[in-house]
Amino acid sequence: MSGRGKQGGKVRAKAKSRSSRAGLQFPVGRVHRLLRKGNYAERVGAGAPVYLAAVLEYLTAEILELAGNAARDNKKTRIIPRHLQLAIRNDEELNKLLGKVTIAQGGVLPNIQAVLLPKKTESQKTKSK
């Protein structure tokens, strides 16, 4: 009867992170903590860190996809800063967003001014016809 331990107690559900509830890989809890500690506002709503984590995850996925394509175009299996640079600078919107950002070891986009290219002479034009 009594004294046999807790028999009718509530079973606590397994803890589920806010990231998994939102279906995200980025840490919602960490983003929330950083928003609170960063003195951006006196109070931080419950939806703000979820939204911010989702935006950060989307931007990261977008950049990594383009950088992966750049790595594959260069016949490489590892993404290096050069691939990130090529991905960002060749995408119009990402270039506008990250226009003032310098990527270490990124290099520059290959570009030769049209004026500097050798002109086709008359003899080359007649040979090609």
From Swiss-Prot:
One of its GO terms (molecular function) is DNA binding. The modification N5-methylglutamine is found at residue 105. GO terms for cellular component: extracellular exosome; nucleosome; nucleus. It holds the Pfam family Histone_H2A_C. Monoubiquitination of Lys-120 (H2AXK119ub) gives a specific tag for epigenetic transcriptional repression. Following DNA double-strand breaks (DSBs), it is ubiquitinated through 'Lys-63' linkage of ubiquitin moieties. The nucleosome is a histone octamer containing two molecules each of H2A, H2B, H3 and H4 assembled in one H3-H4 heterotetramer and two H2A-H2B heterodimers. The octamer wraps approximately 147 bp of DNA. This is Histone H2A.J.
